[in-house]
Amino acid sequence: MVYYEPGQDRNGAALRRSGHVRWFYIMSNVIDERFMAEALKEAEKSANFDEVPVGAVIVKDGKIIARGHNLREKSNDPTAHAEIVAIRKACKKLKSWRLEGCTIYVTIEPCSMCAGTLLWTRIQRIVYGANDIKGGALGSSYNLFEVKNINHKVEITRGVLENRCAALITSFFRSKR
């Protein structure tokens, strides 16, 4: 498992030597922000249905192949988290349970159920917006991916459009109090 903070590149030394560091930072941030903005649109759909506003999109080869938002209340399904909804759609589209070469963009740090499912799909990369200190399974609460016997390594990028993602979820829960 490899973690990246916003603005940190994935090809570090090679890019620094090539002199293209600044361009890569800008391009990777722009791309991540573009897809996170799409995940935020999905999260807003959840909020419109009085669901916890979490959204996700799965990207392969620069194209969105699946979208999802929370549907737990509407479907009476405790597993209908945004990530799981998007994973099911992506697997169906690819006709495979493996999501190798895919990236998921999700507005909040995945819980243990979603992180475990992402691990088993062999997804390449997870990008999330806001930390979830109560239930996040990628380091905020605990880290599911630090289990020693897991062979699959996932690239994780945190904090993309963090303020917008956090504001959406905070606003939702404030309105419930």
Predicted segments with their positions:
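Zinc-dependent deaminase
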Residues: W23-F49, W97, P110-R177
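Short beta-strand scaffold segments in enzyme catalytic cores
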Residues: V54-G62
